[in-house]
Swiss-Prot record:
Classification of source organism: Eukaryota, Fungi, Dikarya, Ascomycota, Pezizomycotina
Disulfide-linked positions: 279-285
Documented EC number(s): 3.2.1.8
Main EC class the enzyme belongs to: hydrolase
PROSITE patterns hit by this protein: GH10_2 (PS51760)
Record: active site: 155, 261
Residue ranges annotated for the GH10 domain, each copy included: 44-324
Source species of the chain: Aspergillus fumigatus (strain ATCC MYA-4609 / CBS 101355 / FGSC A1100 / Af293) (Neosartorya fumigata)
Compartments where found: Secreted
Catalyzed chemical reaction(s): Endohydrolysis of (1->4)-beta-D-xylosidic linkages in xylans
GO BP, one annotated term: xylan catabolic process
Name by which UniProt lists this protein: Endo-1,4-beta-xylanase C
Family designation: Belongs to the glycosyl hydrolase 10 (cellulase F) family.
Organism domain of life: Eukaryota
Primary subcellular site in the record, as a coarse category: secreted
Gene symbol of the encoding locus: xlnC
């Protein structure tokens, strides 16, 4: 009985220690830890359905300081038919952010994907210019003063660094970039205006070099681009080149860069810590957004790329980031 009593006591002690570890994690906030180093936010992607899922929302409220709407601000959601706007989903996210003290990154105003067919069918230059200006003006006016940064144009480059073929580039040439950014600046001068893309994870890669080359040219022409967003959807073990890539993007002359859609196949602690340290080490890197909370809701769920597992439990990478900060 004495042995059993000691065993029970030992189990109780271990349980209390474990509870202490859990409580320590719950007391930490990845956003607070990150911003204590002078950065602006550590955020995540979400939307109404996820914010109404209690386990997901609790983590968002506690751990993240910024929200990016995963789909509710894209063109097919906000203006599915010409001149008829729907802001229900976007309103929900922005209102939640205001009530809970979160910054918002608007995502996205001009993108070739999730684009209504009525826009894709436009072939007249004046018509597309008018449609583009009206869309940007209407969406940005609704949230004026409430959005920290906007992804004004998204994924406009090919892998070799040339401009992607889209209705915007076909009809307007690269001038659609000027039209979009100048319109955005006129509507909300306080918002940071970004160009955002994926596969900008190595300084030597063609798309990264193309982004830097074009942004330098556009800035020299007076186009008001404040920042470059690098989505940073990484494969396992691909984190070591991120710091160099961020440095290259920052060299374009923009005032800031950000990691905007981070997820990493396998979610290894080393990969996540490498990316966080890369942003910390690059002065112009203002923040990191992970592309979701739980693997359950990830667009790459098969590769378990996020900081929380499918049961909303923190992974080793989460704790490694907290420890590194």
């Amino acid at each position: 009985m004495v042995v059993l009593s000691k065993l029970v006591s030992s189990i109780l002690f271990v349980s209390l220690v474990s509870a202490g570890v859990i409580e320590e994690r719950q007391a930490a906030s990845i956003n607070q830890a990150f911003t204590s180093h002078g950065k602006k936010y550590f955020g995540t992607a979400s939307d109404q359905a996820l914010l109404q899922k209690s386990q997901n929302e609790a983590i968002v409220r506690k751990d993240f300081g910024q929200l990016t709407p995963e789909n509710s601000m894209k063109w097919d959601a906000t203006e599915p038919s010409q001149g008829r706007f729907n802001f229900a989903g976007a309103d929900f996210l922005v209102n939640y952010a205001k009530q809970n003290g979160k910054k918002v990154r608007g995502h996205t105003l001009v993108w070739h994907s999730q684009l209504p067919s009525w826009v894709s069918a436009i072939s007249d230059k004046n018509t597309l210019t008018s449609v583009l200006k009206n869309h940007i003006t209407t969406v940005m006016t609704r949230y004026k003063g409430q959005i920290y940064a906007w992804d004004v144009v998204n994924e406009i480059f090919n892998e070799d660094g040339s401009l992607r073929d889209s209705v915007f580039s076909r009809v307007l040439g690269e001038d659609f970039v000027r039209i979009a950014f100048e319109t955005a600046r006129s509507v909300d001068p306080s918002a940071k205006l970004y160009i955002n893309d994926y596969n900008l994870d190595s300084a030597s890669y063609g798309k990264t070099q193309g982004m830097v080359r074009y942004v330098k040219k556009w800035l020299a022409a007076g186009i008001p681009i404040d920042g470059i967003g690098t989505q940073t959807h990484l494969g396992a073990g691909a984190s070591s080149s991120v710091k160099g890539a961020l440095t290259a993007l920052a060299s374009s002359g923009v005032s800031e860069v950000a990691i905007t859609e981070l997820d990493i196949a396998g979610a290894s602690s080393q990969d996540y810590v490498n990316v966080v340290k890369a942003c910390l080490d690059v002065p112009k890197c203002v923040g990191i957004t992970v592309w979701g909370v739980s693997d359950r809701d990830s667009w790459r769920s098969g590769s378990s790329p996020l900081l929380f597992d499918s049961n909303y439990q923190p992974k080793a990478a989460y704790n490694a980031i907290i420890a590194a900060l």
